[in-house]
Amino acid sequence: MDMLKQAGYIEADGTPHQPKDWYELAEMAQKIKQVTGKPGFVLPTAANSGGWLFTQIAWGFGVNFMEKKDGKWTATFNTNECVEALQYVKDLKWKYDCLPSDIIVDGTAYGKIFATGGAAMTFGSGGGTPKMVINYDMDKEDLGMVAIPAGPKGRYALMGGMLICISNKTNQDQQRAIFKWLNLTDISETEKESYKTSQQTFIDKGIQVGPRILSSFTDSSPRQAFYDEWREQNVNVNEANFKLYNDSLNDPSITLRAEEPRCAQDLYGILDGCLQQVLQDKNADCRAILEEANKNFQEQYLNDQEN
């Protein structure tokens, strides 16, 4: 928030400026670096994290990474849309000059760079903010969030999730009961107390209470209503810091998408290589890079997918 303030990107109501699209974000990042001397934006490029978050940018440019037809999967990202998306990332380095000098940035490093004042903006989520404070002693008041910017073909946000393990010793009746329980919109008093206890631990560690977390439950469900009421009663930061992000969770113009349906981690690794090439070489050919990447993904991974 401090670097945005220095560059004039805090609005009169205290909210951080919302970039309408990825190109405005690049312009903001460029100005922030010019004013503060610090990189305006950092994005991961390694350990599959770069490819993972690049899909979110690319969807906004109209990219479809794979298609299934007649039971076979085909790689489909050697397109003009993906060339444009990769060119955008290339321009962050060579046109806008707003990235850190180190271009090999993994999933841990980009959060550390941001949280320790090495860059003004990065990707984030409501559930990912506590580690910024816990791991790197970031001032919780210096952390703000806005909605995902739009691409030429729309606004897309990558959904997260969690793993729930069910014992292989359970029978079918037990499994049905478990899935029914997972979908209950009610919340018991025991669950409420457990939630309050766990969240109080965060508060005691100085974690901010402010950003909402995207939920599979509707706002009107008893469970979500409890979560929202608790958050509102325990907010410990300037709510303007997170207002635009919180509002965006109910914004119908943002399309939520799950990760790619086949060989996602392998795709991310290949896309990491694409990002690194365009950030290392000012003369890199985005189309040639994507043609090779598309071919490799098809031959090395999708050809083995039977359904």
Predicted regions and their residues:
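Alpha-to-beta junction loops
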Residues: 37-39, 116-125, 141
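C-terminal lobe and pocket-closing loops
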Residues: 128-139, 153-158, 164-269
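Glycine-centered hinge/linker elements that transmit conformational signals in sensory
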Residues: 24-31, 71-103, 148
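Bilobed periplasmic-binding protein-like "clamshell/Venus-flytrap" ligand-binding domains
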Residues: 34-46, 188-197, 299-307
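Short helix-initiation/N-cap motifs at beta->coil->alpha
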Residues: 19-24, 101-116
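Short helix-loop capping/hinge motifs at secondary-structure junctions, enriched
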Residues: 3-12, 35, 94-96, 139, ...
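Periplasmic solute-binding protein
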Residues: 1-14, 26, 43-71, 86-89, ...
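Short, solvent-exposed loop/beta-turn-alpha elements that line the ligand-binding surface or hinge
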Residues: 14-18, 63-84, 135-137, 147-156
